[in-house]
């Protein structure tokens, strides 16, 4: 495009920055492979415990059943992708995204301690889960993380993660 100025500040995030964003963000979109090759994407709550990502199947939010499509998909194919992002319409210097490639941990790969740590972390992060039992808990090993940010300015990244100066008009 004639006259277009390309942004030379945009950067690929380091592994540590990706993990920092994953730990701080409040939700993401979990993508699993559905029937006939379709991708099923669903917003999820999650926590990072060490290098494990945990997402609950709860009974807090209204749903017809706890036998969700993502569970069926993960039984057929244990791989998934978690996408987290921040979009600030009026301040593009704060745009970022992180993608984690995941593999579901199987039942024999779970320890009681890890499950309890993840449940405690979920209850600490999301007050709605305090005093509530989970129907199930999806635990994932992270194969890789990658991410992008509009700016490599550490202050812009800090502001983006803290929500500082967020636009309030729409």
Predicted regions and their residues:
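Charged, gly/pro-rich active-site loop segments
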Residues: 1-13, 87-170
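An N-terminal domain-cap segment
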Residues: 2-48
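Amphipathic alpha-helical interface surfaces
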Residues: 18, 66-70, 114-118
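A generic structural signal for short beta-strands and their flanking turns/coil linkers
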Residues: 26-28, 42, 49-53, 76-80, ...
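Short, solvent-exposed loop/turn elements at beta->coil junctions and helix N-caps
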Residues: 31-35, 85-90
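Short glycine/serine/proline-enriched coil/turn segments at secondary-structure junctions
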Residues: 36-38, 63, 90-92
């Amino acid at each position: 495009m004639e006259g277009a100025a390309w942004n030379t500040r945009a950067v690929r995030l380091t592994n540590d920055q990706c993990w920092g964003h994953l730990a701080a963000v409040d939700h993401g979109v979990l993508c699993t492979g559905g029937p006939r090759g379709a991708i099923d994407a669903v917003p999820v709550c999650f926590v990072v415990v060490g290098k494990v990502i945990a997402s609950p199947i709860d009974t807090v939010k209204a749903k017809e059943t706890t036998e969700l499509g993502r569970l069926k998909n993960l039984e057929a194919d244990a791989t998934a992708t978690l996408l987290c992002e921040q979009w600030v319409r009026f301040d593009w210097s704060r745009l970022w995204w992180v993608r984690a490639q995941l593999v579901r941990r199987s039942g024999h790969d779970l320890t009681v301690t890890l499950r309890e740590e993840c449940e405690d972390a979920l209850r600490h992060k999301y007050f709605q889960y305090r005093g509530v039992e989970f129907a199930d808990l999806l635990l994932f090993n992270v194969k890789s993380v990658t991410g992008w940010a509009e700016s490599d300015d550490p202050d812009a990244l800090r502001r983006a993660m803290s929500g500082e100066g967020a636009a309030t008009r729409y």
